[in-house]
Structure formats: C-alpha cells, structure tokens
Amino acid sequence: MGKPAFGRSLLFVSLVVWLAACSGGLFAQSLQLSAPTAAPGEWVAIEMALKSPPGKDILAMQWEMEIPARQLDLANERAMRAVIIVQDAGKSVTCAVPKETRDARIMRCVLAGGQKPIPEGKVTSLSLKILENAQPGPIRVRLQNAVAVSGDLERVSFDPVETTVTVQPR
C-alpha cells in the first residue's frame, strides 16, 4: 500500500475539503446589490438584499457604501431607505457621509430598531443620480465593512460586495 493508497487518501481528503468549502458558501450569510441602468441625468436605485446565516436572525446591521463622486450624486444622507417590510419590523436606516474626497464619498449606514429580526430579502434602497457628465459604461459601487448583530448577540461579518451602475448613451 504505497503510492496508490496515498493518492486515493489525498484525493478523498481533497474532495472533503472541496465539499466543505462549497457548502460553506451555500449556507453563509451574504449581501447582494442590484445593478441598475440609466442615462446621464436620471435617477437609479440600488437595492440591497440580505441572506441571513441559518438559525441566526439579524437584529441590526452597519455597512459602508463607496460611491464614485464624479459620476453619481447623493441627494442627501436620506438617500438610503428601508423597504416597507423592514419598516414593519420596527427598523429604520440612518446614514452619514463621514468621508468625502473629489473621487468618492463613503456613506456609513446603520439599520436597527425594535426586537424583531430584519427579514431576509430586499432590505434597503439607495437612490443616486447619474451626473450629466457621466460617460457611458459601468460605474463601480462598493459595499464594505458590513457587520451585524444576531438575536443571540453574536457578531456576524459580511464579505464586501460590488455592483455596477450602467450608464446608457443618450
């Protein structure tokens, strides 16, 4: 039982590790962003959807959005809104822009309130105006530093996620 047995054992261990890695992604928490399309001068909405970890109700969340300032405009810090089902759970969203440069705005948001969990699915909508001088093509918007607290008061981290706002030609 020399090399062939070792090879089969290595193959088996590799398969188990691969399956564990794949299934972990299937059951992990995640955030997703919609990818809107519009022309310069028009408004778009980026919707954020939540997938909670199994057996973990999310009570509150915090995240940052990196928004390219030369192509997209925030009307104000109230541009982020909780959807109706989230409001019905007693939650509200509050945002601020703690960092702003010529190239980008960092918008930090907190979604919290009440004792009910945040329902899975669409949770917020961010309204942005495509600036008149925006060139046709994709504009990258990034959600980062997202963390949540579960019903059992455990910290839940989320991977960064990106989307694109596609600017159509006029």
Segments the model singles out, each with a brief description of its role:
Residues 2-13:
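Bacterial N-terminal signal peptides that target proteins for export
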Residues 11-25:
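Bacterial N-terminal signal peptides
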Residues 1-4, 168-170:
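Generic detector of intrinsically disordered, low-complexity segments in short proteins
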